[in-house]
Amino acid sequence: MSELVEKTSTLLKYLDLDQRGAVIAEYIWVDSAGHLRSKGRTLQRRVESVDELPEWNFDGSSTGQAPGHDSDVYLKPVAFYPDPFRRGDNIIVLAECWNNDGTPNKYNHRHEAAKLFEAHRAADIWFGLEQEYTLFDHNDNVYGWPKGGFPAPQGPYYCGVGAGKVYARDVVEAHYRACLYAGLRISGINAEVMPSQWEFQVGPCTGITMGDELWVGRYLLHRVAEEFGVKVSFHPKPLKGDWNGAGCHTNVSTREMRQPGGMRYIEEAIDKLSKRHKEHIKLYGSDNELRLTGRHETASMATFSSGVANRGASIRIPRSVSKEGFGYFEDRRPASNIDPYLVTGIICETICGAIENADMSKEFERESS
C-alpha cells in the first residue's frame, strides 16, 4: 500500500522468541490533544487482575499535559487487554493520567464520568458507538483517490463491494480481527458513504466500559494502519465539498427503555436532551460545525430535532424500536473525534440526573483552565 510500511515479515521471527516468563505491558493514555500515546515496560509474570499492574509515569511536558518544571504525570491502570501484536501473555494497559498532587490531570475525563456511572449504576445504561474514520496516504491524500482529483460522486461506496468502490479493506479486516483478539465488544464494520471512509461499531457496553473500549479500538486501528503505511483521521469533515463528514453516532438505552413500554422513557430522555442541546454540542467534538450543517445525513447544529428513522435529525429512533415500543435511541450529533468519556458522561448526566460531585460541562472546561 505504501513504501513507508513496517517490516512485519522480518519482525515475525522475533515475535516467536521465548520471553522467558516475562510479559510486555504496553501502557496507553490520552494526551492533551485527544491523541493516543503509549510506551512499553517489562513485567515479571502474567497479569490476572488490573490491581497487579504498577503505576507508572511519563514526561507530561512532551505531551502538553504538564509544565517543564513539574513534568511528571502518573499513569494509573484501569483496564488491560490481550495484545494482538505481541500476542502470548503480553497486554495493552489503558491508564488514567494523574498529577503528582493526587488530582486527575485536566485531560483525564474518565475519572469524572466514572462518578456518574457509579451513582447511576441501577439505571444499567448501555451505549453503542459507531466510530467513523477516513484513511489517508503518507502524502495526506485520501487513500485510493486520484492524485490531484476526485473519485466519482457519492453513491456506490456505502457498504460497497468491488474494486473502485472500496479501498483498504485489508486494513479494516486486520483491525476487526485485532479487536476480537483483544476481547473488545466490536459488533461490526462497514464502508461509509465517502470512499476511504469506514466505520467500526463497539458495544453494547455498560457505563464507563464504553469509553474504555472505544479508546482501545482507536489505538488498535492506529497500530494496524502503521503496518499498512496509512494514516487514520478522525476529523469530522476531512474534505470540503459534497462529501459526507464523519461522526460517532451514540446509541443509548437504560434498563427501563429496554423493557416493554420503554418508549415512554425514550421520549422522556429525548425531551431532557432537547433542553441541554447547547451544553451537549460543546462536548460533542471540535470542528463539528463543519459537519452538522443539515446536509449529508446530519441535523443543523443550531437546532434540536428528533424523529423515527430520520437520519437528518439530532436524535433518531429506529423504526424497529418505534414498532416494538421499547429499545434504544441514537444521538447522531457527536463527531468522530469525540472523547467518549465526555459524551457518554454528559448523556448519563442529562437523562439519569446530575450528582453533586460531578459536572461534565465543567469537566470539559478544565482543559482551558
From Swiss-Prot:
UniProt similarity note: Belongs to the glutamine synthetase family.
EC number: 6.3.1.2
Residues annotated as domain GS catalytic: 109-369
PANTHER family: GLUTAMINE SYNTHETASE, GLUTAMINE SYNTHETASE 2 CYTOPLASMIC
Entries under SUPFAM superfamilies matching the protein: Glutamine synthetase, N-terminal domain (SSF54368), Glutamine synthetase/guanido kinase (SSF55931)
Subcellular location, record wording: Cytoplasm
Main location: cytoplasm
Single Gene Ontology MF annotation: ATP binding
One GO BP: glutamine biosynthetic process
Keyword ATP-binding in annotation: yes
PROSITE patterns, per the entry: GLNA_1, GLNA_ATP, GS_BETA_GRASP, GS_CATALYTIC
The GS beta-grasp domain, residue ranges: 23-102
Subunit structure: Homooctamer.
Stated name of the protein: Glutamine synthetase
Keywords: ATP-binding, Cytoplasm, Ligase, Nucleotide-binding
Catalyses which reaction(s): L-glutamate + NH4(+) + ATP = L-glutamine + ADP + phosphate + H(+)
GO annotations of cellular component type: cytoplasm; nuclear periphery
Pfam families the record matches: Gln-synt_C, Gln-synt_N
